[in-house]
Every structure is written in C-alpha cells, then in structure tokens.
Amino acid sequence: MDFLELVEKRYSQRRYTAQTVKQEDLDYILKCARMAPSAVNKQPWHIYVLQGEILKQMAPIYRRETFKEAPMCLVITGNHNESWRRYDEKDHCDIDIAIVTEHIVLAAAEKGVDTCWVCNFDVQACKNLLQLPAAEEPIVLIPMGYAPKETVVPEKKRKDIEQIVTYLT
C-alpha cells in the first residue's frame, strides 16, 4: 500500500470490539511514534498506554461509548517546559504532539488497528487520574482496537485541491 492509499484508508473509528491489539502491532506503532520529528528535536511528548482497570477509570474523562468498548487507549502528553519556542515565544508543543499523533494513527492503520484522535476531554481529570507532573499536559487520547465487522467506513469529504492550494511565482 502506498502512502496515499494509507491516508485514504485511515478514518476515525468510534466503535470497537473487545479484541486486544497484538503486542507486536503496538510495538511497531510505538516505534513509528518514536521516529516522529519535532521542532529542534525536543520530542516534548510522553505516551501512556492504558488498558484494563485504568482504562475503565477513564470513562468519565471522555463520556462516549468509545472508552467502554476500546480495549486500549494511548494518552499523549506534552511538556511545555521541554518544547521549542520560536523568537516570538510561540510554543510548538501542540504542533509536535500533532506530528507524533499522526505517526501513531497512520502506523496503526497500516497494521489494521483502528483509532480515533480525541482532543475534547476533561484534561484536568485525566491529569489527576494519571498523576501527571505540573508541566505535563494531556493533549490527545487515542482509543485503539478493531472495528466491528458490520462497520461501514464513511466516505471522506475533503475540499478540492484548488480550494486549499495556491501557487505563487
């Protein structure tokens, strides 16, 4: 599968079976995450792999069925004290987290593991549950697993190239 086929295949899955993610697939996904670039190579992220009881405790943090069904969830945190800031003090932590998250969801798609990129959750409750240090902010949740067989993948609706690209000479 080439890269375009991979990005066309990947979608946000919100329902999961109880089937666990194979350890070798998770290892591959995490190796791909490790290779993600970051501003000035700061790598201001940490990845928490949640399964079992701690995953059940996440249910109130993101109140959708996703956490009740997904057999695993990754929590991607960013450390704003470690991230690069450009000359005007713009913090690139969230940008770096987006890059590592995209590496994760695409590597998962390559292995046939379904994911959903979640940012709308109770950040403080997540931080408390995981007992994170003050400088570490939970930025992304990635429920992971396998879609039920009856899942219909929705058609992707994207703007035309002409709407998003301008050539300047």
Question: Where do the PLM segments sit?
Answer:
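C-terminal helix-cap and adjacent tail motif
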Residues: 3-20, 25, 140-169
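Short secondary-structure boundary segments
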Residues: 78, 120-121, 146
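A glycine-rich helix N-cap at a beta->alpha junction
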Residues: 67-73, 132-153
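Residue-level "edge-of-site" marker
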Residues: 46, 121, 140
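GST superfamily/GST-like fold recognition
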Residues: 113-125
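Short hydrophobic alpha-helices that are characteristic scaffold elements of the AMP-binding
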Residues: 106-109
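Glycine/small-residue-rich phosphate/adenosyl-binding loop
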Residues: 25-31, 35-100
